[in-house]
Amino acid sequence: MLAMAMRKTRPLTIAMLAAMASLTACGGGGASNTISFNSASCGGTWTLAKPGWHTFELYNANDVGGEIDLIDPRTSGVYAEVDQFGPGTTQTMSLDVGSGRYAFRCLFEDTDPMTGPAVTVPGHVKGFTATVPVTNNELVGPAKEYQVYAAAGLKTLVGQTETLASDLQRGNLTAARRDWLPAHLTYETLGAAYDAFGNFDDEIDGRADALGVSNPQWTGFYRLEYGLWHGQSAAELTPYASKLVADVRSLLATWPTMEIPLIDIGLRTHEILENALEFQLTGHDDYGSGTTLASTLANIQGTRELLSLLHPLLVTRYPGLPGVYTWLNRLQTLLEAEHQPGGTWVPVSQLSASARQGIDAACSQALQELAPIASIAEPRNT
């Protein structure tokens, strides 16, 4: 289950094909420009006399918010952006300007996109490379493919939860403990759709945090995990298993009418593992089975699915993409090393200090490599 309200405010974000640069004032004495934006003028008259580090003080003179992009007007590629640009506020943008043409593009609320005058920087000096924007149309295909992927996962999940419920109806707790994990892992591969699932996600995979483990309103996979590994009887758990089956069936039936926001396709490539680091790799989501490392592996599978769908868009826009796979592979190898003979997993609380440090470091580095994708794959009005 992903935490709610996951999208973080990005008051100043840069989407570049080169290394992601800071958008705060940069040291080294770079030239500074103060530029005002309003509904009639997207930057007005401004100059760039030479290549090098430049700092722009951007002032929103409008009474509405919006977004400002620094673009290559020939390709609409984005050098840098100010997102969530509030009225009456000033933001600082710093970047290494190379030779070429530059213009500001304004996307204010309730107005059509507007591009300001272009400025030419002479010479043959290389600076940051502009990222060609991803459009809504380019994300429709990946979104539809993910819809099919999630539907297949939910169909599998129906059968797995039915098996789990049957185990408990027959009073076979050993079989139920065995069959709980593969069912839960299937759900853990569907992380890009959790927000689209809405209340179904709370019913199927909700944590006990707000309710407490004794509250009868707490249901789903974690409720069953708690009972199966805390000595509760099959008779006690059967109603929860039956409800889980009913919820998964209802979700599958409703899924064709649900939509994943296009922005989520790129956003979730980072957020799935971000939540794994916070909840799985800390042991927070371990209600007794000790299998949060397996859940993290399932989260990696879900992340890889998104990357596969986005690959045609990313391969020409993000030169850091090979590093994403390098660190996902490294993290996966470290996790698989904790899979024990007989199918059990080492609980996070029992990891050696070196193993835990290695896993956390690999996950953090993978997240760093994944981070630019949300901005690169964000659909933009051009």
Feature locations, PLM:
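Beta-strand cores of secreted/periplasmic/IMS beta-sandwich domains, seen most often
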Residues: 46-64, 91-106
